[in-house]
Amino acid sequence: MLRSILGTVFACMLGLAALALAPYAAWAEKIDAIAGLGGRWAGMGTIVPASGPSEDFKCVITYFPSEDGTRVRQNLRCQGVNHRFDAAKHLQIDGSEITGRWKENIHSLTGTVSGAVTEEGFVILLSGEFFEAKMTVVSSRCEQSVTVVPERAGQMKELAARLRKC
């Protein structure tokens, strides 16, 4: 049960990584958006559990985009009162398609990322052995936001987070 809860919460946290991938229509714009990821982003989020009070958490995400804008490596460290995460994520960007893999180091969880670019950001599916969650991402130059809703709301109803770089 703990792994299931941690898997669901971690899937939500992974969404933060995708926040920095701003929407783009042309290849040149995509390179600029991916290059803009580089650096440290920090912010706050809230987990709304299936029952009980919401929990706030702090998060720092560092992005390492490739020069050609087709790959992004992300390091994620987040901490709340009851949750702590340390993860790495690798994304591939091919036109409007996003694929990738993630690994959470504390709880030994792994999974895949798949999704598509939309006009405002992304709709992404996070998959793992213990969860599946749909994520809606909206991004601007200095601020990133994400809403994650698990397919099964047994442990969590929603996660919402905001990060800033500027």
Regions found by a protein language model. Name each.
Residues M1-S4:
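Positively charged n-region of N-terminal signal peptides that target proteins for export
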